[in-house]
């Protein structure tokens, strides 16, 4: 390939143009082009040319954490218009101007007055301005510049997530990754090695290692065994400056735990065990425990136990307790010391969760031998059967043998056994048992229809040790004998229609028997052979334990005979057979053409109305009694006597009620006007009933006449004289008692009649003493009194 001079010059020119552009933009040092200012003055154009000016400075840096006594020099601002005569004044504004950064307004030197921290603020943005000191006019436009804080290595690496807790399976391969740790450095990663971190392990060797660049922790050994050591503490260091001398460092702790794997088989502590079990141990109960040890933990130590061989395989069983990991030995069948005194079992314990990576460490199971010694125990008697069932016929005589139970002493001593029935307090004792032989007999006559089955409990004990008891249940079934005749299943209401035809079935009947099925059905129905043939009805046995009632003639009449009676016989199928007789009542009723009953005799009518004969009689009696009471009341009203005095000029009685402040007078019944009307009534009312009369009055015989022929005045005078002289008559004028309202008034009662005095005896002069209100009343009565006197 041929390269010409033209092709080489062009790239060089392009690079120079790029450098010049960057230099002028970055450092604000490019010479600004002159700007033409055009003025229009009276049609002429005047052009002014401005001289070229510009800022001159380098990029500013300030070192962080400067602790010197003098302010730290940052840099210098300079304008091309500054001739060094002090006419240019430099002004600094922006972040930290005047507080952190100060400027010499004459020279443009910038100093830092405080210690800065790059980790808090990496740079500051400020503005520079150059003005004429005399006119305060800007010589340069305001320009922005940046002061960067230069980093130093003042921050150590830090582990943000420590300390760490991590696990790794035991027996892991070398180089297995455990954990990656990361440390951070707050220094500037773009400047020097202040933030370049290198990892190393300070503690935990030779078991673990760490990658210096990534911080990944790995296992450094093969087959680390948890059973030998489970916990490890590893210290990791992170150092900046790429691990060089003088670099800052930080550390963290990583706690590593080896998790378990199934790498250990179970082991029995002993190869031979011996266990004592008494022969009285209950079937299903636990008789012993055995345990194999496993160095693993959790599910890796789970195991199951089994009986692999031995002469007690069918007698004992073993199960596993998952919580304690023990083998529980239980009894499957009862033990008998007299038959076998010891057993031998081979028991195996095997892990249930296997890890095939470690199968070469197996087998993961172990076996041991267990010898069981059976202990001799004095046992209660043993019945020959677990339960007994016996039978006896009902109505058997008292003392009938039902059956026999048998119990023996299972021990070698073979002592005698006694029997008794274990009754409850409320049981009715129908049986007893011979204490020596165990024979059960009846003590009462049994009835199968009342109780078909009995359950009793028989107990047996040894003579030498009565406290040892054994029990057995004896069920006694009562067998049936044919001792109950059949009877009708229910009461039948049989109806025959008046328009019935011969051979018509009017009803079907059935029977029941309290005896067992063998002595009950089949039932036979028939008419009594000793009676004459019934001309009206007959009976047909349906041979299915039912019978039909049939008519033997046409038409029945209620007016001639409304009820018929049909005697029948029923026999059962027992041996010997029993029979009974019953009488069927057949009513004659009027029916519709379709056979529906329309009406029967009076009893049927009452039944349809819902009333019985007794209820109807009671209703009729009540009606008769009510009618008799009404008639008697009317008769008494009509027979009442009229009063003797009947006149149009009869005395009128007016009762006037005033405001009475007392309890009423005692003489309210003293005067009765009927005495003037009926003299005989007056004779009854004039005597007092509260006292016995002192003088017996002679009866007065006088002929009564009509009211027109009697002198009323003489009659009244005569009665008044008799009343005044008779001490036994009621007092017509009596003292009235009222509520007490002060001293007794001098005025007397004016509401009663004085039968023994007259108005002339009254003295009304006292009215003048009552006051001026009663003066007129006193004068009025005084004049009347004076007129009477004259």
From Swiss-Prot:
Residues 25-53 form a propeptide. Glycans are attached at residues 36, 255, 455, 536. The modification Phosphoserine is found at residue 786. PROSITE patterns: CADHERIN_1 (PS00232), CADHERIN_2 (PS50268). GO terms for biological process: adherens junction organization; calcium-dependent cell-cell adhesion via plasma membrane cell adhesion molecules; cell migration; cell morphogenesis; cell-cell adhesion mediated by cadherin; cell-cell junction assembly; homophilic cell adhesion via plasma membrane adhesion molecules. Residues 1-24 form the signal peptide. Residues 54-608 are extracellular. It is found in: Cell membrane. Gene3D superfamilies: Cadherins, TCF3-CBD (Catenin binding domain). It is a single-pass type I membrane protein. Residues 54-159, 160-268, 269-383, 384-486, 487-608 form the Cadherin domain. GO terms for cellular component: adherens junction; catenin complex. InterPro entries: Cadherin (IPR039808), Cadherin-like_dom (IPR002126), Cadherin-like_sf (IPR015919), Cadherin_CS (IPR020894), Cadherin_Y-type_LIR (IPR000233), Catenin-bd_sf (IPR027397). GO terms for molecular function: beta-catenin binding; cadherin binding; calcium ion binding. The chain crosses the membrane at residues 609-636. Residues 637-790 are cytoplasmic. Cadherins are calcium-dependent cell adhesion proteins. They preferentially interact with themselves in a homophilic manner in connecting cells; cadherins may thus contribute to the sorting of heterogeneous cell types. Three calcium ions are usually bound at the interface of each cadherin domain and rigidify the connections, imparting a strong curvature to the full-length ectodomain. This is Cadherin-18. It comes from Bos taurus. The lineage of its organism: Eukaryota, Metazoa, Chordata, Craniata, Vertebrata. The gene is CDH18.
């Amino acid at each position: 390939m041929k390269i010409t001079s033209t092709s080489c010059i062009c790239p060089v020119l392009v690079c120079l143009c790029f450098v010049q552009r960057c230099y002028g933009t970055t450092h604000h040092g490019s010479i600004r082009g002159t700007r033409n200012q055009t003025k229009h003055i009276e049609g002429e154009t005047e052009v002014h040319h401005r001289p070229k000016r510009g800022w001159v400075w380098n990029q500013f840096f300030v070192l962080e954490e400067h602790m010197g006594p003098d302010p730290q020099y940052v840099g210098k601002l300079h304008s091309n218009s500054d001739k060094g005569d002090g006419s240019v004044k430099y002004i600094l504004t922006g972040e930290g101007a005047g507080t952190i950064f100060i400027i010499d307004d004459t020279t443009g030197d910038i100093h830092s007055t405080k210690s800065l921290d790059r980790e808090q603020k990496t740079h500051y943005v400020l503005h520079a301005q150059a003005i004429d000191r005399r006119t305060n006019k800007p010589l340069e436009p305001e320009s922005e510049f940046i002061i960067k804080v230069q980093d130093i290595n003042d921050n150590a690496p830090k582990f943000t997530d420590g300390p760490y807790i991590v696990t790794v399976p035991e027996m892991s391969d070398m180089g297995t990754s455990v954990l990656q740790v990361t440390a951070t450095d707050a220094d500037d990663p773009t400047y020097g090695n202040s933030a370049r971190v290198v990892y190393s392990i300070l503690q935990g060797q030779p078991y673990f290692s760490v990658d210096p660049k990534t911080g990944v922790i790995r296992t450094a050994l093969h087959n680390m065994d948890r059973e030998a050591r489970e916990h490890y503490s590893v210290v990791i260091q992170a150092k900046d400056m790429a691990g060089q001398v003088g670099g800052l460092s930080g550390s963290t702790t990583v706690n590593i735990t080896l998790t378990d794997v199934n790498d250990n088989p179970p082991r029995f502590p002993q190869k031979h065990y011996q266990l004592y079990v008494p022969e009285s141990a209950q079937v299903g109960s636990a008789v012993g425990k055995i345990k194999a040890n496993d160095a693993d933990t959790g599910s890796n130590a789970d195991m199951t136990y089994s009986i692999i061989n031995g002469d007690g395989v069918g007698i004992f069983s073993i199960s596993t307790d998952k919580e304690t990991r023990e083998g529980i030995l239980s009894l499957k069948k009862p033990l008998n010391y007299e038959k076998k005194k010891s057993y031998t079992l081979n028991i195996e314990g095997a892990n249930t969760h296997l890890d095939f990576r470690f199968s070469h460490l197996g087998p993961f199971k172990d076996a041991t031998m267990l010898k069981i010694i059976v202990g001799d125990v004095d046992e209660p008697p043993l019945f020959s059967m677990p339960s007994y069932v016996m039978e006896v016929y009902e109505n058997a005589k008292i003392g009938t043998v039902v059956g026999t139970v048998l119990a023996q002493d299972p021990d070698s001593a073979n002592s005698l056994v006694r029997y008794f029935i274990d009754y409850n307090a409320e049981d009715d004792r129908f049986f007893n048992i011979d204490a020596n032989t165990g024979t059960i007999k009846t003590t009462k006559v049994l009835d199968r229809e009342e109780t078909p089955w009995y359950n009793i409990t028989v107990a047996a004990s040894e003579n030498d040790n009565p406290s040892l008891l054994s029990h057995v249940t004896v069920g006694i079934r009562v067998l049936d004998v044919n001792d109950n005749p059949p009877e009708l299943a229910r009461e039948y209401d049989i109806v025959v229609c008046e328009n019935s035809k011969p051979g018509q079935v009017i009803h079907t009947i059935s029977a029941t028997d309290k005896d067992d099925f063998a002595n009950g059905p089949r039932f036979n129905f028939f008419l009594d052979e000793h009676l004459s043939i019934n001309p009206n009805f007959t009976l047909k046995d349906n041979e299915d334990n039912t019978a039909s009632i049939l008519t033997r003639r046409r038409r029945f009449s209620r007016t001639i005979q409304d009820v018929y009676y049909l005697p029948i016989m029923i026999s059962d199928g027992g041996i010997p057979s029993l029979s009974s007789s019953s009488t069927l009542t057949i009513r004659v009723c009027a029916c519709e053409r379709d056979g529906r009953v329309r009406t029967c005799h009076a009893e049927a009518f009452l039944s349809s109305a819902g009333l019985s004969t007794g209820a109807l009689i009671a209703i009729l009696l009540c009606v008769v009694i009510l009618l008799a009471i009404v008639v008697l009341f009317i008769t008494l009203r009509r027979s009442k006597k009229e009063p003797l005095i009947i006149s149009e000029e009869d005395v009128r009685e007016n009762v006037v009620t005033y405001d009475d402040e007392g309890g009423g007078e005692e003489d309210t019944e003293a005067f009765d006007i009927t005495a003037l009307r009926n003299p005989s009534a007056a004779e009854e009312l004039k005597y007092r009933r509260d006292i016995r009369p002192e003088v017996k009055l002679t009866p007065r015989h006088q002929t009564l006449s009509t009211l027109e022929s009697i002198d009323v005045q003489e009659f009244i005078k005569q009665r008044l004289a008799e009343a005044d002289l008779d001490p036994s008559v009621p007092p017509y004028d009596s003292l009235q008692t009222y509520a007490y309202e002060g001293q007794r008034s001098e005025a007397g009662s004016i509401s009663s009649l004085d039968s023994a005095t007259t108005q002339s005896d009254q003295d009304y002069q006292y009215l003048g003493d009552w006051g001026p209100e009663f003066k007129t009343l006193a004068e009025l009565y005084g004049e009347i009194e004076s007129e009477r006197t004259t």
